[in-house]
Curated annotation (Swiss-Prot):
Keyword annotations of the record: Allosteric enzyme, ATP-binding, Glycolysis, Kinase, Magnesium, Metal-binding, Nucleotide-binding, Potassium, Pyruvate, Transferase
Swiss-Prot/TrEMBL cofactor(s): Mg(2+); K(+)
Lineage, broadest ranks: Eukaryota, Discoba, Euglenozoa, Kinetoplastea, Metakinetoplastina
One GO MF term: magnesium ion binding
Swiss-Prot/TrEMBL catalytic activity: pyruvate + ATP = phosphoenolpyruvate + ADP + H(+)
Sequence positions that bind K(+): N52, S54, D84, T85
Name of the protein: Pyruvate kinase 2
Family the entry assigns: Belongs to the pyruvate kinase family.
Binding-site residues, Mg(2+): E241, D265
Entries under Gene3D superfamilies matching the protein: Phosphoenolpyruvate-binding domains, PK beta-barrel domain-like, Pyruvate kinase, C-terminal domain
Keyword Iron belongs to the record: no
Pathway info: Carbohydrate degradation; glycolysis; pyruvate from D-glyceraldehyde 3-phosphate: step 5/5
Assembly and interaction partners: Homotetramer.
Length: 499
């Protein structure tokens, strides 16, 4: 059946899926930092708690981490914790009077001369990027205050100064962000603040880093180096926020553990109408190689102050699911919004509805046909297990995986049932929260003293499937694991009727 034939058969009157495949990342802020508020978010569907290090002190984020862990422990859940770096930025300096109002047609000079750093005026103000005059050509654009004000470069006055035409009315205040669309920007991946924040994150045992403004694969490696030996197991999710990141996406995906399509800054750096194309392309590339991908920014933004989303926002979330995103993310909606629980519940319901419109077997075949032959043995076993799950209409898949690699490989092939991963590592439980369809179960090997008893772990997973109503007595569950003679990858697939 083709995708078109599948779409024709869709019905709003059919029951929705029993499980939600897509995961939800929630930004934690004043509206949701308390233990009680976090418990409500978790009950509503939050999978990962995001801390935005562009705001707040280490003490503030320490409180968030403690509260997330306390709330998760009370509910018996494994919630991932993500540190979102501020990243390298270009900003204006200070204005002599604190602010300046510009009108269309005004002429202003922007300079990298430190003498103007704290004394900006309507005629001339400072930008803290030394390579500005080399990066932006005559005729190019400078976006000020996250793109709200646009300058067109008229001429290069000297090695530090550009003369610009103001395109629109705007009141500009101190330390506003600068974007240079279409320009090659040479900034370090890890600022001094980022370095301190990453050290803090490693010390606190965060599960993943959302690395901001990644432009090249080398910058991903810089972030990895900054995490050091103690942070070697932390996932790096690279945020694509500019045209260089889009241009170098293949190598960035290869160097990263996952990708975030950060549509806010991306929609400033490239034309807004091209963001949908970039989103679909990036998500598809991640799907083919099996890397988790998050779609973020303005997904249900109206719910920051309204109890219901707009129809366009509902379609936006659904479209991200249809594109193939593993996760969808909420920012201000949960950090400072009036309706944090409602927005997560809405997002969860939208994701479940959108699942019904995905043609899983078409996705499976498309991904498999794009793989290089020969496959590695582990991937061959996992892809064959997914094929079996489709053929027997399995209600769940069960995999034993300490690192989570096998669970991610199974997820890559997009089975239309939940993937239950039994693991002996708590960090793996939390990190798998950015991978589509995966639900983790912790097996405490130290407590049981049965680290090598695979049948006990299989039983734990089957009992969990029954308890959580993923499957019922008589349903088929596909089980993937290694036998005792093989180390490092699974080599067995079993079909079990749930007792």
């Amino acid at each position: 059946m083709s995708q078109l034939e599948h779409n024709i058969g869709l019905s709003i009157f059919e029951p929705v899926a029993k499980h939600r495949a897509n995961r939800i990342v929630c930004t934690i802020g004043p509206s949701t930092q308390s233990v009680e508020a976090l418990k409500n978010l978790m009950k509503s569907g939050m999978s990962v708690a995001r801390m935005n290090f562009s705001h707040g002190s280490h003490e503030y984020h320490q409180t968030t981490i403690n509260n997330v862990r306390a709330a998760a422990a009370e509910l018996g859940l494994h919630i991932g914790i993500a540190l979102d770096t501020k990243g390298p930025e270009i900003r204006t300096g200070l204005f002599k009077d604190g602010e300046v109002t510009f009108a269309p047609g005004d002429i202003v000079c922007v300079t990298t001369d430190p003498a103007y750093e704290k004394v900006g005026t309507k005629e001339k103000f400072y930008i803290d990027y030394p390579q500005l005059t080399k990066a932006v050509p005559v005729g190019g654009s400078i976006y000020v205050d996250d793109g709200v004000m646009t300058l067109r470069v008229l001429s290069k006055e000297d090695d530090r100064t550009l003369k610009c035409h103001v395109n629109n009315h705007h009141r500009l205040t101190d330390r506003r962000g600068i974007n240079l669309p279409g320009c090659e920007v040479d900034l370090p991946a890890v600022s001094e603040k980022d370095r301190k924040d990453l050290e803090f994150g490693v010390a606190q045992g965060v599960d993943m880093i959302f690395a901001s403004f990644i432009r090249t694969a080398e910058q991903v490696r810089e972030v990895r180096a900054a995490l050091g030996e103690k942070g070697k197991d932390i996932l790096i999710i690279s945020k694509i926020e500019n045209h260089q990141g889009v241009q170098n996406i293949d190598s960035i995906i290869e160097a990263s553990n996952g990708i975030m399509v950060a549509r806010g800054d991306l929609g400033v750096e490239i034309p807004a109408e091209k963001v949908c194309v970039a989103q679909m392309c990036i998500i598809s590339k991640c799907n083919v190689v099996g890397k988790p991908v998050i779609c973020a920014t303005q997904m249900l933004e109206s719910m920051t102050s309204n109890p219901r989303p707009t129809r366009a926002e509902v379609s936006d979330v659904a479209n991200a699911v249809l594109n193939g995103a593993d996760c969808v993310m909420l920012s201000g909606e949960t950090a400072k919004g009036k309706y944090p629980n409602e927005v997560v519940q809405y997002m969860a319901r939208i994701c479940v509805e959108a699942q019904s419109a995905t043609h899983d077997t078409v996705m499976f075949n498309s991904i498999k046909n794009l793989q290089k032959i020969p496959m590695c043995p582990e991937e061959a076993v996992c892809s064959s297990a997914v094929a079996s799950a489709f053929e027997v209409q399995a209600k769940a898949m069960l995999v034993l995986s300490n690192t989570g690699r096998s669970a991610r490989l199974i997820s890559k092939y997009r089975p239309n049932c939940p993937i239950i991963c039994v693991t002996t590592r708590l960090q793996t439980c939390r990190q798998l929260n950015v991978t589509r369809s995966v639900v983790s179960v912790f097996y405490d090997a130290a407590k049981s003293g049965e680290d090598k008893d695979k049948e006990k772990r299989v039983k734990l997973g089957l009992d969990f499937a029954k308890k959580e109503k993923y499957a019922s007595t008589g349903d088929v569950v596909v089980v993937v694991h290694a036998d005792h003679s093989v180390k490092g990858y699974p080599n067995q697939t079993r079909l079990i009727y749930l007792p």
